[in-house]
Swiss-Prot record:
Broad class of enzyme this protein falls into: oxidoreductase
Superkingdom: Bacteria
Pfam families according to UniProt: Transket_pyr, Transketolase_C
Its job: The pyruvate dehydrogenase complex catalyzes the overall conversion of pyruvate to acetyl-CoA and CO(2). It contains multiple copies of three enzymatic components: pyruvate dehydrogenase (E1), dihydrolipoamide acetyltransferase (E2) and lipoamide dehydrogenase (E3).
SMART domains: Transket_pyr
Upper lineage: Bacteria, Pseudomonadati, Pseudomonadota, Alphaproteobacteria, Rickettsiales
Organism: Rickettsia bellii (strain RML369-C)
Subunit structure: Heterodimer of an alpha and a beta chain.
InterPro entries in the record: PDHB_mito-type (IPR027110), THDP-binding (IPR029061), Transketo_C/PFOR_II (IPR009014), Transketolase-like_Pyr-bd (IPR005475), Transketolase_C (IPR033248)
Name of the featured protein: Pyruvate dehydrogenase E1 component subunit beta
Binding sites annotated in the UniProt record for thiamine diphosphate: E59
Keywords from the UniProt entry: Oxidoreductase, Pyruvate, Thiamine pyrophosphate
Amino acid sequence: MQITVREALRDAMQEEMIRDDKVFVMGEEVAEYQGAYKVTQGLLEQFGPKRVIDTPITEYGFAGLAVGAAFAGLRPIVEFMTFNFAMQAMDHIVNSAAKTHYMSGGQVRCPIVFRGPNGAASRVAAQHSQNYAACYSYIPGLKVVAPYSAEDHKGLMITAIRDDNPVIFLENEILYGHSFDISENVEPIPFGKAKVLKEGDSVTIVTFSIQVKLALDAANILQSDNINCEVIDLRTIKPLDIDTIIESVKKTGRLVVIEEGWFFAGIGATIAAIVMKEAFDYLDAPVEIVSGKDVPLPYAVNLEKLALPSEYDVINAVKKVCYIK
């Protein structure tokens, strides 16, 4: 059976709303319009306006309302039309949601999911194309999820909704319409468990979200040069499954990390630092990081393409760590 990513997300929310009447959805256009990307399609009709709530265009306002509801024992799912707009709500996310469990000595929980599209789409320009994966991963108290397949979106969303503290669920606008095979019964997927999508012994490629497709496509091309790539989908960035990465590096001796976001202070840099510390003796080459260029993402289609990681970039990075010209 195949379903799209948007259907997988909708199904996860629907099932959890049936299972637990404390779960509700709120955000801009999630009810009457059924979501800017139709992820909440059918939920208003099924659960009514008290549990599927349209909000004004005020991320700071409704994020704060949702955090307060979570403190009171409800389980809000907050949809941001894009995580670029979540910048308006950073105080509530970083200072209220992420900190209160610690600052209350464990007395106050904040079971909330912040979800929506993150990163580049297609010609939506610099203010609507930013990738916040590294930004949120930097904050203690937040879990950060960035799946690729439909099944992982569903299983990880179920886990996120059931979590007793805040989860940042980073989706991708382009992936919403992609179809994937999915199991008949999808179980919750634990956080911090990466997935090896392709086994190999030449080089380890680590990535997440839509860049998984880029990694798999590049790996298939490199196969013709007898370079067997092991491709790892992180699925969750925080907690990070460093054990799976290190076990792979012990086998391959080489590591390439792909991320759509910028290089400086990025996820690739963090993974490289950990691997250099924990598995230095197993490395046969310096770690390579393929990332977005250090510019605001352009609107022009030719410049946008140049600013984002490409198959060419990945293939070159893999050949570099394999010392192949």
